[in-house]
């Protein structure tokens, strides 16, 4: 209901309206000042992996509202869930047929003010984003000496480096959903299917990327314009069948594809004072297939039994990333930049991950409201990453460059065949890794009412976890890093109901933060020359978190839309994992280290009220204090005292909604939504390099939906009205 009222189109837009939650760059979730690694996402209660190796969480905007029944966000830990979260557990429940047959279709059209009907640049591309570009696999698999001969006989690349200009047209999208019930054998068979497609065009003009040391010295800087084309596809199928009166079994299939193609035009100066101009093209294709089966069975009035299992296959492909760099001469002319062979290149990267989950749990009821829960869970995750680079050796090649956009008159296959350009295929053991994780878990939990208005929930979870990464050093030596742990995770949750309107909650728990695969793997990744590099740390260890919450809430009995809550929380972080920033070769290098301890504490306030008929307002805000104590031998850190990486000191959400109903049941829903995220540290500086910070960000959105009848409605959505420079 809230998603409909506020015009929310996907899960990410809904989650970021919740108290204490914000979305950082690249869709990373920040909860109570804790970054992506401190939260977890499940689909219908089962873990779901992220296809993006940079993030632990699956991008939440991959789930369109048309496929979602509800979103449950829990910021306190319960023993029935995996223990690897201290921020939030976000469970996305996909739609099920509620017994009412329906079919609906929706279409949308839109665009961004600074993009629509403006010039839009893109590098040469063979297929649309519905298909994956690629390279003949035999050019990846063959021996190096064979490749050097084969490339002179056949061009393995289907694209060139030309940049084309067009006019940005409106964005189009659509969704379709339907459901139907049948009576089979005296039971109900339900089928639901939904899908959505959307595309987005976005431009960023006159942006600046600069690397500074703590003393203020500029190592390099680049101005750039960015042109991004993005496609999102999602599909859901759900088949359910009832057994007996209260039993049921079901199967759910979810598919999502997020594909983006970004062209960057960059100008600037590197660390060695070369004045440069660059064309970069980056394509990311993330796909997810998730299969789930589940069953629910009741045995008498006291016992019930749940079983479920899932298989997820995620793929992350970065096909044919291209970079072409020019150096500006004093007379303004251009020549190919040839500092080393890495300035002009192509890159192909593929990540494949498979995850299996099995879950069994049972509940025994005694008394009027008391319960005992028992359960066991198994999870196995396997990842494989491979990458190949093709460097263009341009030494001795001096073409006449008159147009930096159209380059196929000299960057062509003919010049490869005649020897003016030499292609070097680079495949090294250090540019690939394998990783895996296995968890065996069991839990017990009791919900007991010593008196009618006081709930005591006490749980204990045991997890045996093994996480490993196989990688290679720069010298090609095979290495294996393993984290093997046996842990107990207690959880205490108390609720005292003062009366029908007021209640108080208290929670305490211990949880774990495990490093992600990419954080553990010493694999160097860089999207563009002079841009930030990412390099994992094989020495990372698990971090542990001690969490405490105290919450008061009031819901008016005669109108639950009117509510007020205030929450105080504190977290002690033992060995928290921090994203650090160093420099190498003039470029920033982001890596990861365990700090000694950290603290996160804050106050959250939420207020919702129906001011008068059909007119509602809501405000929620958070004030957060975070601090990291660095190891005594951690002298590499530039600043000895600072807040947690990714934490904003304050967050505010506010909304006003007007929803009158007119004659013939026509209805208007109009909402104005405001959000501010305070400044935050993106990456921690070490070895004299300063912390990388993001300033406060303000956004204002307007959404209007007009329901003409039960079968037809119109929606207008305007986002980021403030258009703040970032």
Residue ranges, per PLM feature:
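Conserved C-terminal beta-signal and adjacent last beta-strands/turns
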Residues: 344-351, 361-363, 492, 506, ...
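Gram-negative outer-membrane beta-barrel transporters
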Residues: 565-572, 591-681
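Periplasmic N-terminal accessory/gating domains of Gram-negative outer-membrane beta-barrel systems
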Residues: 1-30, 45-79, 86
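Signature of Gram-negative outer-membrane beta-barrel scaffolds
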Residues: 345, 349, 356, 365-500, ...
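Surface-exposed extracellular loop regions of Gram-negative outer-membrane beta-barrel proteins
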Residues: 46-47, 259-261, 315-317, 335, ...
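Repeated loop/turn-to-beta-strand initiation elements of outer-membrane beta-barrel proteins
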Residues: 246-249, 302-305, 369-372, 453-456, ...
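Transmembrane beta-barrel wall of Gram-negative outer-membrane proteins
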Residues: 157-264, 286-291, 299-300, 492
